[in-house]
Regions:
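Short, conserved alpha-helical segments within structured domains
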Residues: 18-22, 43, 114
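A generic local structural motif
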Residues: 31-33, 136-137
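Juxtamembrane/interface motifs at transmembrane-helix termini
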Residues: 21-24, 33-35, 49, 76-78
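A short helix-loop-beta-strand connector motif used in the catalytic cores of GNAT acetyltransferases and
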Residues: 32-46
Length: 158
């Protein structure tokens, strides 16, 4: 995690958290994640290369709105693996699991408008663009930014 994406400011520039300064930052967050697995509603996965099992990213449910049977997903992948279809394949698999095993009705994702590549992943996965949330996001610098929101319904993929 540290070597493949967390320490690289370029890799996390469209995320809400800063690049890890050293391996101890990564250990701290990994321990927090492990602790969250005690919660039955924790959905967090590593993204690995099929041939080597090298960890190159993560994808997880960052918010659950139970009354609406909705969840929101967040993801990150090493820039070394951008534009190779890996995130699209990963997102499709996670959406399938969340719809068919967990039972969500709606899945949504957001991205900073400065990062249209993330939106292209969402569209490739069948998500619908819903609009811009003005100054909804906060960059890892603390600056507010506009975010685009996409969603997909379970009925969209039947």
């Amino acid at each position: 995690m540290f070597d493949n994406w967390a320490k690289d400011p370029e890799n996390v520039k469209y995320l809400s958290w800063q690049a890890h300064k050293d391996i101890n930052d990564t250990y701290k967050i990994l321990n927090e994640w492990i602790d969250k697995y005690k919660n039955k509603n924790c959905y967090k996965w590593c993204i690995t290369l099929k041939d080597t099992n090298e960890v190159i990213g993560s994808i997880d449910v960052i918010e659950i709105i139970e009354i609406r049977s909705t969840c929101e997903i967040g993801y990150v992948i090493s820039k070394k693996y951008w534009n190779k279809g890996i995130m699209t394949e990963t997102l499709r698999a996670v959406m399938n699991y969340l719809f068919n095993t967990v039972g969500f009705n709606r899945i949504q994702l957001r991205h900073m408008t400065e990062n249209p590549a993330s939106g292209r992943v969402m569209v490739k996965c069948g998500m619908k663009y819903e609009g811009i949330l003005r100054q909804y996001g906060v960059k890892n610098t603390g600056e507010r930014c506009d975010t685009a929101i996409y969603s997909i319904l379970k009925s969209d993929i039947l």
